[in-house]
Amino acid sequence: MSLTEARFHELIDDLQQNVEDVFEDSDLDVDLENSAGVLSVRFENGSQLILSRQEPLRQLWLAARSGGFHFDYDEAGGRWICDASGDSLGELLARVTLEQIGEELEFPEL
């Protein structure tokens, strides 16, 4: 069953808020900007992560220094799963954050 447009936007809105909460609750110096469905996380070292919704595809895309990742929502598991690696969004966010700034963060809700 494919996601309805309303459900897709609800999931992305919740996800982006969860990501913002993790960074805001950390001791990291980050700039967060959420505009037009795109969440940008800018780190003190100048690197960034960009989470964007791809409405026509019902996908979430993550751009990081190490590359671009596309995620589909798994209704059964309640998680966004990378279509290339099978990793959850939370696993990939933890990995790319460590790679980009050398800090370990957990994204348990993702």
UniProtKB/Swiss-Prot annotation:
Gene Ontology CC: one annotated term: cytosol
Pfam family, one: Frataxin_Cyay
Entry keyword annotation includes Cell membrane: no
Molecular functions per Gene Ontology: ferric iron binding; ferrous iron binding
Signal peptide segment: none
GO biological process: one example: iron-sulfur cluster assembly
InterPro entries on file: CyaY (IPR047584), Frataxin/CyaY (IPR002908), Frataxin/CyaY_sf (IPR036524), Frataxin_CS (IPR020895)
HAMAP family: CyaY (MF_00142)
NCBIfam families per the UniProt record, alphabetical: FeS_CyaY
Protein's job: Involved in iron-sulfur (Fe-S) cluster assembly. May act as a regulator of Fe-S biogenesis.
Cited PANTHER family: FRATAXIN, FRATAXIN, MITOCHONDRIAL
Name the record gives this protein: Iron-sulfur cluster assembly protein CyaY
Gene: cyaY
